[in-house]
């Protein structure tokens, strides 16, 4: 019996790509080596029909590549050729107004393009039954695959570091400023207990660019973002209550925005943890 050939097109090389696309399909092949052959291709040749028709199943996250409309046409072509198309989605297509790219999504109608891809896909996989019910308004063939990890992966087996403090950790991305702001009152109320608590902010990152627009000429200029301008710097001010819960010396160290070590950081009430690759990021859980 011939193997079922599966093509996986991840949306990125970070968390979503790893945990929603790459790892599950590697597991599928490893558990069923006689039945499945899986190829993972980040940038497939979109216009090569022979490439696509060598597969029985094509799985992708939200879209096959960044061009949603081109992906939609490709999905319909694959359907017509008998290739099973499977669209995975883990986030609602229209984030709230507090989300940093809400306006970009709305202006470019990306939400509508995502829904259009859901409609033409043969099957849709998602994270929860609640979200599945929303998707079923557009496509009845929805299967729930909850987010999952491989607990035997080394990054999830890191032993928890010992501490006399109650450590409160946060791991997340750069789109959660509004969520962190909701915690501000809680952080403020715990200020009097700063000697018994340590906040651990994971994923700190100063990379990125900003686009400045000349009001007179309309000219767009892109430059590297300055560390104090990053959302992570704003997170840090909330966690530390504008640096009031840490020593003045540690504050000076943090405001250098470099990754040099600080000898006494474990005795401070706040710990900055710089971002790590997706294959080792979960080691941060050992810090709280």
Locate each region found by the language model.
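Active-site proximal beta-strand in glycosyltransferases
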Residues: 78-95
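Conserved catalytic-core segment of nucleotide-activated headgroup transferases in glycan assembly
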Residues: 12-27, 150-156, 161-284
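An aromatic- and histidine-rich active-site surface loop
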Residues: 62-80, 180-182
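Donor nucleotide-sugar binding/catalytic pocket of nucleotide-sugar-dependent glycosyltransferases
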Residues: 119-156
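Nucleotide-sugar donor phosphate/pyrophosphate-binding loop at the beta->alpha transition
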Residues: 44-46, 84, 95-116, 151
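N-terminal pre-catalytic "stem/leader" segment of glycosyltransferase-like enzymes
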Residues: 1-66, 212
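Structural alpha-helical scaffold elements that stabilize or flank donor/cofactor-binding regions
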Residues: 51, 116-117, 284
